[in-house]
Curated annotation (Swiss-Prot):
Coiled coil: none annotated. The gene is dsdA. The modification N6-(pyridoxal phosphate)lysine is found at residue 111. This is Probable D-serine dehydratase. One of its GO terms (biological process) is isoleucine biosynthetic process. It comes from Lactiplantibacillus plantarum (strain ATCC BAA-793 / NCIMB 8826 / WCFS1).
Length: 436
């Protein structure tokens, strides 16, 4: 691709090539659009989650206290806020919250929403086709041996850098599906170990994520009884994430967080392939409308959604096309080509994007432990990096009546040794800043 022509049309690409953090403001935000999905699709997904709640409560006792509903807390960050202000040398007039998907049950990440949902839907389809299960039945019956034997005749395949593999792998193996995960070179070892411990077959490929997906897709295509979870374009994954809009609306009400034209809410979502943040953002906008503003956060080395949306080439361009290496410590964001759905559905719904340098992730995750005793993995701290640049770009989102929600996408299942390494690196980087 001719980057000279691209830079003429989109001058910010020069900054992307130089790996400098930028804010990209979406020129199409708020325009009318014919979207491929509707609110009715979201409520269909809500109903399916509720049908499966009795099964989840039995299969995963950690969900029993919530009656089988998988949801994360919305945490006020009263101690983190002054720490953020000190790090950024500026005040944060509004309120700061963490949407702690890092604490979601079963797989400890935002992927619990989409990955688990898609497996639930596949299990429902298989059960409906081959048994007398009805939509009004108690779905806890799906945890019995009869259904386990049925599901064992079917397979599930997914390609992932890590967290989607955990959610799909653990859920599919629990049903009894023959489960295979194809993983790229940047997947963390502990995630591979966890999957194998749950009876999942892990195929490791020494290539990047975008190259793994076609291999996984081809493997699934060889067997009519195998379902492929497509992180680049799955409608069901997308709708599983979108249910977050319904859930967050309720949490805002319960916690007395006002949202109207004078009290906007900004939501900061880390983006890799763009599937999970797009699904969540779609749900937020469909359910709550004009006064909630989604922002995507991406590494300077892998700004795939930013590049795809800026050029309107979407999945037809990868970060390597402009000379970037696609490497980042944020393993869940190490995706060089955006999903087919991300750019298309987000075209009028996404306020913009902000890119960040990896070191900042460690600084924020360490501060989050020190101030709130909350543990997240590096990519889950990405939202903190976007607050200052977004407030600078959009002064109306910098006032005292604004609520800022950082979406922490994963981290609860990290081994203690991994957490400690991340924390210590954050400490070193913070010391470096203090010694300047």
């Amino acid at each position: 691709m001719d980057t000279t022509v691209m830079i003429e049309e989109h001058p910010q690409i020069k900054e992307l090539i130089a790996k400098r953090p930028i804010v990209w403001q979406n020129p199409d935000y708020g325009k009318r659009a014919d979207l491929p999905l509707t609110r009715a699709d979201i409520f269909d997904a809500v109903a399916r989650w509720e049908r499966f709640a009795p099964f989840l409560a039995v299969a995963f006792p950690e969900t029993a206290a919530m009656n089988g509903i998988i949801e994360s807390p919305l945490l006020p960050l009263e101690q983190m806020k002054p720490a953020w202000e000190a790090l950024n040398h500026q005040s944060l007039a509004g309120q700061l919250y963490l949407k702690a998907d890092s604490q979601l049950p079963i797989s400890g990440s935002i992927k619990s929403r989409g990955g688990i949902y898609e497996v639930l839907k596949f299990a429902e389809q298989v059960a409906m086709a081959h048994t007398d299960l009805t939509y009004m039945d108690d779905y806890s019956v799906l945890a019995t041996a009869k259904y386990h034997e049925l599901f064992a005749q079917y397979g599930v395949i997914v390609a992932s850098t890590g967290n989607l593999a955990l959610s799909v792998g653990i859920m599919a193996a629990t049903f009894g599906f023959k489960t295979t995960v194809y993983m790229s070179h940047d997947a963390r070892q502990w995630k591979k170990d966890k999957l194998r411990a749950n009876g999942v077959t892990v195929e490791e490929l020494n290539t990047d994520f975008s190259s793994v997906i076609p291999v996984a897709r081809a493997a699934a295509a060889k067997d009519d009884h195998t379902h492929f979870v497509d992180d680049e374009g799955s409608r069901d994954l997308f709708l599983g994430y979108a249910v977050a809009g319904v859930r967050l609306q309720h949490q805002l009400k319960v916690q007395g967080i006002k949202m109207d034209a004078a009290h906007p809410v900004v939501v900061y979502l880390p983006a890799g392939v763009g599937g999970s943040p797009s699904g969540v953002a779609f749900g937020l906008k469909m359910i709550m409308g004009a006064n909630i503003y989604p922002v995507f956060c991406e590494p300077t080395h892998v700004p795939s959604v930013t590049l795809g949306m800026m050029t309107k080439l979407n999945e037809k361009i990868a970060v390597q096309d402009i000379g970037l290496d696609g490497l980042t410590a944020a393993d869940g964001l190490a995706v060089s080509r955006p999903s087919r759905l991300a750019g298309k559905v987000m075209r009028t719904l996404l306020l913009g994007t902000a890119t960040f340098e990896d070191d900042d992730l460690y600084r924020y995750l360490t501060k989050l432990v020190d101030t709130e005793d909350v543990i997240v993995e590096p990519s889950a701290a990405a939202g903190f990096t976007a607050i200052a640049p977004i407030m600078a770009q959009f002064p109306t989102l910098a006032g005292k009546d604004v609520t800022h929600i950082v979406w922490a996408t994963g981290g609860d299942m990290m081994p203690e040794s991994e957490r400690q390494l991340d924390y210590e690196l954050g400490q070193k980087l913070l010391t470096k800043i203090n010694n300047r």
